[in-house]
Amino acid sequence: CEIGRSAVKGRAVLYPQPFGKVTAGADKDYPVDFSHFNIQGTCVGAVGVEADSDKAIFPAVDIATEVGAKDKIKMRVPFFTGALGSTEIARLHWEGIAVGAGISGTLVVVGENVCGMDPQAEFKNGRVVNSPELKRRVEIFKQWQEDAGEIVVQYNVEDGRLGVPQYAVEKLGVKMIEAKWGQGAKDIGGEVKLPSLERAKQLKERGYIVLPDPDSPVNQDAFRAGAFTEFERHSRLGMVDEEKFVQQFVREVAGLRSLGAKHISLKTGAYRPADLARAVRCASEARIDLLTVDGAGGGTGMSPWRMMNEWGIPTVYLECLLHNYLSRLAKKGAFI
């Protein structure tokens, strides 16, 4: 059916449908994935609770943890949310996820392009000075945050150019900033579909790559005539210099700290093994607080089907590589 529809509809079936209303991930089977792992318990002793038959019930177990290099962030649960960026489905469901993270005492991550995609955002000299959408997201979490957890604001190439980290730290009081290499689980696929010419032109003015070019009279006429019905906004891929990647990242982290960011995170996608090694080394030498390694299979779940299915290293295999790299660094006495 998918092949048949593609033959008839072409680009219309590149993405999971209906676009913006559903999330989807890769449906490709691998020899090993997380569904093959089961939790192994024991009747001898206990971890996280006293080994007492009258006390060892699962609601009583302490599963709290912490993240951070120097100043630790307390977390009442050992997991946190994925990054929820500028997609419509992320915007619609932000409140429930942010409230849940605040109550649970964990991290919630604002993904890329939120300010750039905010229709009501205000810019001065190419820098964001007001973003009601980012402000809304931060305030919702802070209303429900107690003594644990934190809100993280992620930035990519466009966000950096628009001054999103500065705005988040200085104007909204955000304490944790996440640098992003590429497009997370999709590596290079940072697309959003745009249904109107006005929206396409607005985002091009804000510095995004928009295809087809909405300023071209030929494309404008073709769009109005119905030759195509949507534009695509693309995010740029963050390029890392092969020889100077560590120095580049250390400088970037120092710049974020000088802004007042208390905690720094790096998010890298499911690139080839050498790139994961670069990310691990950068994280170690810059002594950041958190490294997020995003496996293949889909991010928010609105990427092209082929990107989610055919690109990157599956998560289990990627985590095995990560464990290997960290173990090797630990043996050398490096910062982990």
Give each language-model segment a name.
Residues 79-92, 154-160, 183, 236-245, ...:
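Active-site mouth loops of central-metabolism enzymes
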Residues 77-82, 106-112, 149-155, 175-181, ...:
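Hydrophobic faces of well-ordered beta-strands that scaffold small-molecule active sites
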Residues 1-76, 89-95, 99-102, 107, ...:
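Conserved, well-structured core domains of diverse proteins
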Residues 75-78, 92, 97, 106-107, ...:
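Flavin-dependent oxidoreductase catalytic cores
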Residues 228-336:
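Glycine-rich phosphate/ribose-binding loops and adjacent secondary-structure elements
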Residues 90-91, 118-138, 159-166, 187-195, ...:
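Active-site-adjacent beta->alpha loops and helix N-cap segments on the catalytic face
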Residues 142-170, 317, 324, 333-334:
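Phosphate/diphosphate-binding loops
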Residues 174-182, 186-188, 192-271:
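Metal-dependent enolase-superfamily TIM-barrel catalytic cores that perform enediolate-based chemistry
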